[in-house]
Amino acid sequence: PVGWNLPMGSIHRKNHGDGFMLLGDAAGLVDPFTGEGIGNAMVAAKYAVRVAKKAHHLGEFNAKIFQEYDELVWEELGGELGTSAKLQKLARYSFLLNFVIKRAARSKDVQEIISGMLSNEIARDDLSNPSFYFKILLS
């Protein structure tokens, strides 16, 4: 079997043009840190339907009309995808990743913090903040 890499959401790719809007993996909306994409695809679908209805009403299906779709999607998902891209880069530092994992293995509080961030209950931005690691150090 031959496969291909999924386009991660760390880069804002063109997701529309004359007569089309791309959603989900095709639009590069895969979360760079978790690899999850279904939730982002559903967000994109919500906006694609809204913009497609507008385009149908106007009888225009050009890139200019579909630009609104791009703006809506990235307004909602851009910040989260950007943070996930930062986290992906942070994970390349094995000493930092090992430090967090070792702390999580010993501390229920750290486990809950990380779990909350991965489930979006706690802001992921905290993971890229040095104070987060200081907090873990003291846990």
Model segments located where?
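FAD/FMN-dependent oxidoreductases across multiple families
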Residues: 1-51, 57
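C-terminal helical "tail/cap" subdomain of flavin- and related membrane-associated enzymes
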Residues: 53-139
